[in-house]
Amino acid sequence: MPAALITVASLGLPLLFVLYLRESDAFRDLPRRELALTAALGVVLGVGWALLTGAAVARSYGVPLGAGIAAERILRDGIAVPLGSMLLMLVPALVTRWSWRGEREALDGYVIGALGALTFTAAANLARLAPQFTTGMVNRVRPLDGLLVEAGVRGVAMPLTAAGVGGLIGTALWFTRPPTKVHQHRVFVRAILVVIAVVVVAIYALLGVVDVARLPQLVQLALHLTLTGIALFALRVGLHLALLHEVQDDMHADEPILCGECNH
């Protein structure tokens, strides 16, 4: 991949997410120390994981999509590596949850989980694709359609899937039930958590199998985008349930609603 495409594909969505946090005043509501800790852990773990597993996924990242690898390596390169990546991707959210002080809200967990997953994915992609920076701004060897498909997978599908999974797990870690509902629907809540865990594991296992399978490029892109849609749908359902059943803020109906821009 050309250097410019690598940079945009790796950093595009993380930068958009940071801009989203800024515009939604998340930096005002969330401790900046926790945000910095989450991002730093994601970068360190992403680079370390990329260096550790570079040989195992070299063909997946260093040659055109669809080239495939030997069938006997599917279990290791197609399942073990993606699942290990998923577990490490969640470490920033787990560490931040352990060090968290103060009240917990599901939306805070979503932000922390998605931020950790996006920084992990971006750092891992940059570390793995760094040798390809030598191709310069233009790559005259790879066909354009192959570059666009790879950019769609590395720059759109993978980070969106990571953000969906990380945000979902973060939401679960920060979810707090009100005292009046602690013992209500306990079986239902546990069943939802089990389903979420199964969906997350299945998504990342399937992503790895898709990467190592000998499939046409457009088919791989379509499968990646399908799994991304499933991850985002699971995030939507999980976040909706968490917001409905978590501890609600005190209501002050008699207070005026102020403009967010001028405070009047």
Annotate the PLM regions:
Residues M1-H264:
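Hydrophobic alpha-helical segments at protein termini of multi-pass membrane proteins
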